[in-house]
């Protein structure tokens, strides 16, 4: 029976070590999530500044407007890629945590079964010790999960706003180009009329509407 207890204790220690390793990975993931949150906040501030400069941007050349849209698209794609990587890491850590929890419950069950013929005080003390360590790891994983979900929601909301604003800018740019084209045509027609009136050899152009009315 002592061999069984020793084996169970060794397995429990191994599980604790694995939990510590995953705890380190979770800390790294939390740091990445914090960095992503800071970048999201920076993008929000950038969006507010861009909205304040919308009036000025309308009078800028089309190339400047297109360049700004391209830069925003690159930033959105980069954030979406990082968000996807963080989602994948979160799923991997959750799967690993579920596996460790399953192994831990199995070991504790074996330990409790073996404790029927051994000192229950030692077994309960060991159980409490490992339960505290496991609970600490679970709390950190839950904290990481909450931060990740908040970052994902913020990123999705910001991405939708950026997408709608880009669509509006593209529509506005299209209207401005149409107005510019109409202005160019009107200017050319006016220039032709002025040239015809100032030319001494130009023959008078009959008024088609007037001829039709007389007929």
UniProtKB/Swiss-Prot annotation:
Cited InterPro entries: SIKE (IPR008555)
User: What keywords does the record list, in alphabetical order?
Assistant: Coiled coil, Cytoplasm
Annotated spans, Disordered: 193-215
Pfam families assigned: SIKE
What GO cellular component term, any one, is given? cytoplasm
Its main localization is cytoplasm
Q: Which GO terms describe its biological process?
A: response to wounding
* Coiled coil (UniProt feature): 12-186
Cellular localisation: Cytoplasm
State the family named in the UniProt similarity comment for this chain: Belongs to the SIKE family.
| Name the record gives this protein | FGFR1 oncogene partner 2 homolog
Organism listed in the record: Xenopus laevis (African clawed frog)
């Amino acid at each position: 029976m002592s061999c069984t207890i020793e084996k169970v204790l060794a397995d429990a220690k191994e599980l604790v070590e694995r939990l510590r390793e995953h705890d380190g990975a979770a800390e790294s993931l939390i740091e990445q999530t914090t960095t992503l949150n800071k970048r999201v906040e920076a993008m929000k501030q950038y969006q507010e500044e861009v909205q304040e400069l919308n009036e000025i941007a309308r009078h800028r050349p089309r190339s400047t407007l297109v360049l700004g849209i391209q830069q925003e698209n690159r930033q959105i794609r980069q954030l979406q890629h990082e968000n996807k990587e963080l989602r994948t890491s979160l799923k991997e850590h959750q799967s690993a945590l579920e596996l460790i929890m399953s192994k831990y419950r199995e070991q504790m069950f074996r330990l409790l079964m073996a404790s029927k013929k051994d000192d229950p005080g030692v077994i309960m003390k060991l159980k409490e010790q490992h339960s505290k360590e496991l609970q600490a790891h679970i709390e950190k994983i839950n904290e990481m999960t909450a931060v990740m979900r908040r970052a994902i929601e913020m990123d999705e909301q910001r991405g939708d706003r950026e997408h709608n604003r880009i669509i509006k800018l593209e529509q506005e740019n299209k209207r401005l180009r149409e107005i510019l084209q109409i202005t160019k045509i009107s200017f050319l027609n006016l220039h032709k009329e002025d040239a015809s009136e100032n030319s001494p050899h130009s023959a008078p152009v009959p008024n088609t509407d007037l001829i039709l009315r007389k007929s």
